């Protein structure tokens, strides 16, 4: 298992490398910070700004550091440099606004370039207990059941027993459909050795 301190040092260095004097504010948020807290090496880093002009600065800054745009998504850009993935998202009013729109409290974490931490009141307690508590947002409603399955595979438990019952039913329905669902390899999991 990777040490929390090692990952934190890498994140700290990343923030320092991206920052420059009088630069616009930017922040990391979501799953990468969750993984760092849990001592897991993040598969990617979610990063954004509070305005479109600041986002343009951030993209330009990352490109100047060697990151290249690999794909454009509904949520922003996927950038890569030396096997480090960045999901550069569209701006929000504030880090608090951004994390209030995530799916679960364990993902409701953000840290800005001044190292100020923003989080839901139960984020760290839920992470320590591997408890999955859904936030009441509409942004992820279409994929919430699939995301719950992803977290149960990481040994998270639901805060609400009723949710566990619903998920079991969803797993059964999904299992029946599985043979007809095509497999798509995620670019982040691509391994040249597998060819």
Language-model regions: role of each:
Residues 1-195:
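Catalytic cores of the polymerase beta-like nucleotidyltransferase superfamily
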